[in-house]
Amino acid sequence: MDLFDLIGPVMIGPSSSHTAGAARIGLTARLLLGEEVARAEIGLHGSFAKTYRGHGTDRALVGGLMGMQVDDPRLRDSLTLAREKGMKLIFSAVNLRGAHPNTVRMTVTGVTGRMLTIEAASVGGGNIEVHRLDGLNVVFTGKENTLIIHHTDAPGMIAAVTGLLAKEALNIANMQVYRRQAGADAMMVLELDGVPAPETLEAIRALTDIRSATFLKRRTC
């Protein structure tokens, strides 16, 4: 734990857990979707559900979905800005048994119709943990360079991806693989010491059985 975990980041207030962390969850969802958000169904669990209006969690989540950083002054007006853009927003309270009290489950739809479901928690100091993506259990924080690959579970898939990273001399600091069952949906989460070139990401996306590959650059604040 470092100082920023205790005092939180530079942000639009009032709370690092309820605003900064929420904005980061929204921004992570936007980056993973890979396009502008047209519709968001936002299910709030625990303390998020109880205090989201008073603490600005709703504005922070939506601001993140619109691509805003935690210190963007437009976060305060994000609900108005979203509606002006025609974004459809649906908020509800949900009970996610056993989840962290500051957890949100969102299903977002992009302007092309692409959909993504994400479940993530704001765990303090503006930090987040993503726990589920499109129904698959995952764990990542976004504090490191992170490559998230949605693919079909198939022999040789891990070797193909890591081989392309090795060609660029990219070191893998941490790697986890999650799957629904053998031969079904799977997710690779790789934390990297460096940043892959666009050509490397395109080569990964071109592999057979790859559904999507998204790179999240390490947070700097």
Kindly give the residue locations of the regions a language model identified.
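Conserved phosphate/anionic-ligand binding catalytic regions in large, soluble enzymes, centered on
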Residues: 9-26
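A conserved regulatory-domain signal marking ACT and ACT-like small-molecule sensing domains
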Residues: 118-221
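A structural-propensity feature for long, helix-poor, extended segments
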Residues: 41, 45-84
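Short glycine/threonine-rich loop-to-helix capping motif typified by GTGT followed
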Residues: 51-59, 101, 187-191
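Non-transmembrane, aqueous-exposed alpha-helical and coiled segments at domain scale
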Residues: 32-41, 101, 108
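Generic N-terminal amphipathic, Lys/Arg-enriched alpha-helix
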Residues: 2-14, 213
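General beta-strand structural signal in soluble alpha/beta enzymes
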Residues: 44, 90-91, 174, 215
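Contiguous domain-boundary segments centered on the initiation and propagation of an alpha-helix
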Residues: 66-116
